[in-house]
Structures are given as C-alpha cells and as structure tokens.
C-alpha cells in the first residue's frame, strides 16, 4: 500500500507502508492555526472532535 503522508498545506508526498498495512488515513482537526490535516498509513484511534477517514487503495487519503 502507498499512502500520502504530507501535513496540511505542504506539497504532496507519499510513502510505502510496511508489509501487511493495507489502510491509509486522513485525520483533521481545528486549533488556533486553523484546520490541521495529518495523513499516513494505518487507521489510528482518535479522540472525539477529530475527523478520521480511512481507506484501502493507493494514495486514497488526500
């Protein structure tokens, strides 16, 4: 699996996930800087107030 891993407004980058990791995630929340977006491999647990989208195809988490 290959997932995007660039933060918020940075240029797009992606990376290959470890063997057996088939999910990508896109996590969003707001703070004093505005909307923060984090991307990567896997499908992490998140606290309430954080929007999480997980998907299972290459580069699906932009």
From Swiss-Prot:
Q: What GO cellular-component annotations does this UniProt entry give?
A: extracellular region
Tagged with keyword Transcription regulation? no
| Record key words, sorted | Acetylcholine receptor inhibiting toxin, Disulfide bond, Ion channel impairing toxin, Neurotoxin, Postsynaptic neurotoxin, Secreted, Toxin
- Report the SS bond pairs: 3-24, 17-41, 43-54, 55-60
Instruction: Let me know which tissues express this protein, per UniProt.
Output: Expressed by the venom gland.
What the entry lists under InterPro entries is as follows:
Snake_3FTx, Snake_toxin-like_sf, Snake_toxin_con_site, Toxin_cobra-type
Asked if the record carries the keyword Metal-binding, the reply is no
Q: Which PROSITE patterns match?
A: SNAKE_TOXIN (PS00272)
Gene Ontology molecular function, alphabetical: acetylcholine receptor inhibitor activity; ion channel regulator activity; toxin activity
Q: Where is this region: Disordered?
A: 1-21
Name its cellular compartments. Secreted
Q: What is this protein called?
A: Short neurotoxin B
Q: Which family does it belong to?
A: Belongs to the three-finger toxin family. Short-chain subfamily. Type I alpha-neurotoxin sub-subfamily.
């Amino acid at each position: 699996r290959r997932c995007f891993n660039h933060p918020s407004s940075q240029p797009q980058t992606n990376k290959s996930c470890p063997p057996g990791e088939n999910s990508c995630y896109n996590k969003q929340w707001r703070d004093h800087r505005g909307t923060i977006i984090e991307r990567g491999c896997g499908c992490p647990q998140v606290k309430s107030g954080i929007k999480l989208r997980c998907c299972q195809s290459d580069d699906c988490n932009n």
